[in-house]
């Protein structure tokens, strides 16, 4: 929920009027409807899709305006390069750690051991589209895709990295022009206020979107679909929770704040992510709340959007854990060298994964298509439960990017500790 920092303190509204309570109630009602009337629940997918489309509609202008005004406000352009270097260094270190955690847990718990699945018996027709999407991915193709065909096409298509690329160039140009560009900067600052007010309006529909998305998930896949492969789902959830509380918790403590207080501060957004299974649905609110928590606008504008492509801790845990699950289920014994190769490939293929529903599955397909030891057809084993793991991936990704923003802001000396303390309580 967007809060106008300039507004006078208001009387605290009743609990039931908060976005947190409304989204939570919507999720519960969606689960009940999908369970009691699955045919009806399965028809409500458009509600969730429509809400995500509404949010995606506003993501491009939010990123563009925030990044441009943030860069234009930098005293020295050298600051931009330094912030980017620190951010990507953090992304690489923590993402690699997440991959290692997934690999370690899979080796210790061995969730796929004893299934003895013959690859020839698997029906891989359902993963053909994912495999094709993965095959189309390449490092060169990914880098070329960052450059839009035109300046306007980046905003029109809403690709996050393209919008970020254009915004950085535009912000640098404004900074180089200097005082003559001040009227343009002032106009963009006013547009930022308008766009975030629009975000607040769109968030009113969040409970409807969460209700439809959850009713569809339970209605189509059913609660019972978790039974056969529940071990993998439970293992992934516990691993992700442990990663957030222990790994990110330690990082947060070193940076001078509590991970639990940060999670409580972002509870509205986390419920929104849970209901829609998309961390993108809460991106505009995350940027606003990180600024309110004392992180400087240039830091927020650079770290949050890039983190949505390069700092996906939940997706990284999922990839190595799921890959080893498939190998174990198909009785493929991976040597240490093969597991290291898997980790290195996953480090590359995970970069650029979008924060939308199902992107983690495509990224896994991209990884397995490069690693010959693990059969891509084995992905058919987890296709039915991937939707249930998507929520956890998105939540972990979201918290990871919030932590990254505060950490980079602290490294840069661009963190208002008093604001952070007041926000987190």
Curated annotation (Swiss-Prot):
InterPro entries linked: C4_dicarb_transport, Na-dicarboxylate_symporter, Na-dicarboxylate_symporter_CS, Na:dicarbo_symporter_sf
Signal peptide region: none
GO molecular function, one term: fumarate transmembrane transporter activity
GO cellular component, one term: plasma membrane
Keyword Transmembrane included in the entry's annotation: yes
Any GO BP annotation: L-aspartate transmembrane transport
Coiled coil, from the record: none
Domain of life, per lineage: Bacteria
One Pfam short name: SDF
Topology of the protein relative to the lipid bilayer: Multi-pass membrane protein
Subcellular location as annotated: Cell inner membrane
Sorted UniProt keywords: Cell inner membrane, Cell membrane, Membrane, Symport, Transmembrane, Transmembrane helix, Transport
Transmembrane feature ranges: 18-38, 54-74, 88-108, 137-157, 158-178, 198-218, 232-252, 317-337, 365-385
Family: Belongs to the dicarboxylate/amino acid:cation symporter (DAACS) (TC 2.A.23) family.
Its job: Responsible for the transport of dicarboxylates such as succinate, fumarate, and malate from the periplasm across the membrane.
Name of the protein in question: C4-dicarboxylate transport protein
Protein's organism: Rhizorhabdus wittichii (strain DSM 6014 / CCUG 31198 / JCM 15750 / NBRC 105917 / EY 4224 / RW1)
